[in-house]
Amino acid sequence: MQLTPREVEKLMIYTLSDVAFKRKARGLKLNYPEAVSIITVTAMEGARDGKSVEDVMKEASQVLTKDDVMDGVADLIPNVQVEAIFTDGSRLVTVHDPIK
């Protein structure tokens, strides 16, 4: 299978988010890459599901709380940007203050 660098990056994000969701379900606190991957995948999947940009941003900003992440991780992530594929094309989605 021949994948573009962008497709390889998406696969890595989805793989890490799968691990992160499982760790979160076990009650483990997430580190920086795990938290970013969950926020990113939530945004990408919301877009793919046909949700509006506003709904995607809102959902992605509510998927994690400070209790879900290791100390200091929330402060390291002031925003997350991801190019998501919506039903009418791709858009850059910026999730501000994604961990509250």
Curated annotation (Swiss-Prot):
Reaction catalysis annotation: urea + 2 H2O + H(+) = hydrogencarbonate + 2 NH4(+)
GO cellular component, one term: cytoplasm
Pathway noted in the entry: Nitrogen metabolism; urea degradation; CO(2) and NH(3) from urea (urease route): step 1/1
UniProt KW Magnesium keyword: no
Cytoplasm is among the record's keywords: yes
N-terminal signal peptide: none
SUPFAM superfamilies named in the record: Urease, gamma-subunit (SSF54111)
Keywords assigned by UniProt, alphabetized: Cytoplasm, Hydrolase
GO biological process: urea catabolic process
UniProt-listed Enzyme Commission number(s): 3.5.1.5
Cell compartments where the protein resides: Cytoplasm
Protein origin, superkingdom: Bacteria
MF (Gene Ontology): nickel cation binding; urease activity
Similarity comment text for this entry: Belongs to the urease gamma subunit family.
NCBIfam families to which the protein is assigned, alphabetical: PRK13241.1 (NF009712), urease_gam (TIGR00193)
Quaternary state and interactors: Heterotrimer of UreA (gamma), UreB (beta) and UreC (alpha) subunits. Three heterotrimers associate to form the active enzyme.
Protein's name according to its UniProt entry: Urease subunit gamma
